[in-house]
Structures are given as structure tokens and as C-alpha cells.
Amino acid sequence: PLAKMLHEKHPGVRLMVDNCYGEFVCEKEPSHYGADVCVGSLIKNPGGGLAPTGGYIVGTQDAIERIAYRLTAPGIGLEVGSYAASYQPFYQGLFMAPHTVAQAIKTACLAARVFEILGMTTTPAADEPRADIIQAIQMRTPERLVAFCQGIQMASPIDSMALPEPWDMPGYNDQVVMAAGTFVAGASIELSADAPMREPYTAYMQGGLTYTHGRIALQMALNRMVEQGALTLK
């Protein structure tokens, strides 16, 4: 493995993995393969849809101790807290996370299969192994892409009345369209979709707190695409 080779050649080097979107998808995490540190976001997979903010760092005792001293102060480390409100939603979300991630993966597999049947390219395919919760779907036309995102937004629990339109988002060379009617802003473990407005007009869908909601959202997205004349169902 890469980690073993790295540690043998450079014993003082620490290997860090950004595992955002990947937690609880596979049977083993990067730390099982020798990563010294893994980091990610608590408003994504490991927060289970309940964590309101924050990120996490896990790793070897030596690595975490060094990080803690840098974060706070030497000698203090982890002896001080970081969130005054309450840690309950973080721990409860972590408890729920494996199940919630499973719901998101089932939603992604369903989306992949549905759009494969409609003749579109999906990555990964419905029957391919997965390492994260992201599902890419090549919509091929801008009209189809926008209609899909609008349908996902219409099925959202928050701001379902909003209709996403492409806009000039800072940091991107192309216009971007986003559907994200989530309880927690930026929580990609909740069902959302986004895409740059460029060929092949690929939608990146992720999340889904429940498989039931994922199925409803996909149905509404297909309906929106048909209503807008972007898709014809035989």
C-alpha cells in the first residue's frame, strides 16, 4: 500500500486523507490502510444530517496531539472545547450516519439506474463499486440539466418554491446551477444537486436523508424535465 511505502521511505512524514463524502461508504476507512490523519465535514456523511456545523479530525495519537497543540496552544491541546451550544447533535448524528449514508447510496444507485435506462451516461454506473455518495449524470443539454436541478429543488423540504437558475458563482469559470433545499446550509448529506453549465452538462447529485425522499425527488425531477420539454419518456 501507498501508506506503508511512504512510511518506510520517510518515517517522519504524516499521510493525511481528505475523506469528505467518503465516510461509511466502504467497509474500511483510509485509516485502516495506514493514513495517519483523516479529515472531513460534519455537515456531510459523518454528521448524519443532524450536526449543524463543524468538521472532524481523526488519526493516530501522536498526530492528533500535534494537531491539537497547533489548534489551541502547546500544553492545552484537547483540554478545551470548541462548541459551546451542545455536542448532542454531533454524537447523535454520528450514531445515525452509517444508516443515513446507506440511504444516500441507495438514492444514488436508483438515480444511476433510472438515467441509464433513459440512455444517459452515469458515473459510477448503478452496479459499479462506490467510494463516495456523489452521483454524476451526463444530461447532455443545458435545458435538461436546469430542469433536473429545478425538480430536485421542488422536492426539497426547504425553499421548495425556489427555482434554481444558472448564475455567475465566484470561483468558477462557468455559470453554476444548484439545488440545495437543505435544513443545514451546505449539508450535502441532505439531497442536493449542482453543476457547471458546460458540456456534457453533468449534474452532480448527492445525499438523501431517506431513500423514500430520494425516490420522490427523482420522480419530481423527471416530471419537471418532461414538463419543460427537456425529456421525452416512451
Range-by-range predicted roles:
Residues 1-102, 106, 115, 119-122, ...:
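Conserved PLP-enzyme active-site core in the AAT-like
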Residues 2, 26, 63, 67, ...:
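General structural feature for long, well-ordered alpha-helical segments within catalytic domains
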Residues 116-233:
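Conserved C-terminal alpha-helix-loop-beta "cap" of PLP-dependent enzymes
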